[in-house]
């Protein structure tokens, strides 16, 4: 009724009991919500990101399990105020390591989040690395933007948002299983994930690589779907220099074509093809 009477309205459900068809149509015995919070993804994602990088290889499936049910509902990936209050720490402070490591971890985390199927919700202040937990009794710590690391994180999230809007591959097939393909979901030893997001037109698809360890991989080889040119459109520095890598005939990740890329510690790379 609400959706029918108010054009442009979005109704989002927070539900954690696995009740079926929350976003299904009412005429199909669904509840009729526009979107549902993906609580499973959120819990697994945050548990993984809080781990010391050494132990991530033993928890590799926490970042892949969500794809086994990603199309059962119309999901929104949520980092809400609930996750940055009551001694749970801010997103930046959840990350392991020294301050520089925390920022690098968070950039990798946000890249994975923005490239994973599902709409996005990131609570205010987490885009620039708020240190204190959120409180309704005070404003955000805007003074942190006077520090280079926090400005750099804000700029990186802004670049992610621009990339998200530019490429329909990141949103146009959120509810279509054919819009996602793992390249390598099983590289737990190196804690690297690689996958493809496909656009509705099958053009301007994106190849995504995320490294969740402080180990540099100077000759990281990634298998690719086709023998084409792959243009770098985002890296961990927020650079969009559009370097081009040409696939060659060399087996990798159970695919006949691949290319090598210098993947930094906590590095991310998004390629358009």
Please describe what each predicted stretch is:
Residues 100-103, 114-122, 126-273:
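Carbohydrate-interacting/catalytic domains
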Residues 1-120, 128, 135, 172-178, ...:
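Alpha-amylase-like alpha-glycosidases and glucanotransferases acting on alpha-linked glucans and related
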